[in-house]
């Protein structure tokens, strides 16, 4: 009987830990999925600005 109670306690503890970790990783994933596209857009804009700057320099060269 004591062994069954211990197994039940271990099962519930494991269940709680798994649910908490799933919630934490789920929130981190959703946050990351929102931030990554923003970061990629920032880098692509910098590249576009650099290309436009080079085009202007080429036009202005005598």
From Swiss-Prot:
Its main location: secreted. Keywords: Antibiotic, Antimicrobial, Cytolysis, Fungicide, Hemolysis, Membrane, Secreted, Signal, Target cell membrane, Target membrane, Toxin. It is found in: Secreted; Target cell membrane. One of its GO terms (biological process) is defense response to bacterium. Residues 49-62 form a propeptide. Residues 1-23 form the signal peptide. Expressed by the venom gland. GO terms for cellular component: extracellular region; membrane; other organism cell membrane. GO terms for molecular function: toxin activity. Antimicrobial peptide with potent activity against a range of Gram-positive and Gram-negative bacteria. Has high hemolytic activity against erythrocytes. May act by disrupting the integrity of the bacterial cell membrane. Belongs to the non-disulfide-bridged peptide (NDBP) superfamily. Medium-length antimicrobial peptide (group 3) family. Ponericin-W subfamily. This is Ponericin-W-like 32.2. It comes from Lychas mucronatus (Chinese swimming scorpion).
């Amino acid at each position: 009987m004591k062994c069954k109670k211990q197994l039940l306690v271990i099962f519930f503890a494991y269940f709680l830990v798994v649910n908490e970790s799933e919630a934490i990783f789920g929130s981190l994933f959703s946050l990351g999925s929102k931030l990554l596209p923003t970061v990629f857009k920032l880098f692509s804009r910098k590249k576009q600005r650099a290309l436009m700057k080079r085009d202007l320099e080429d036009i202005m060269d005598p």
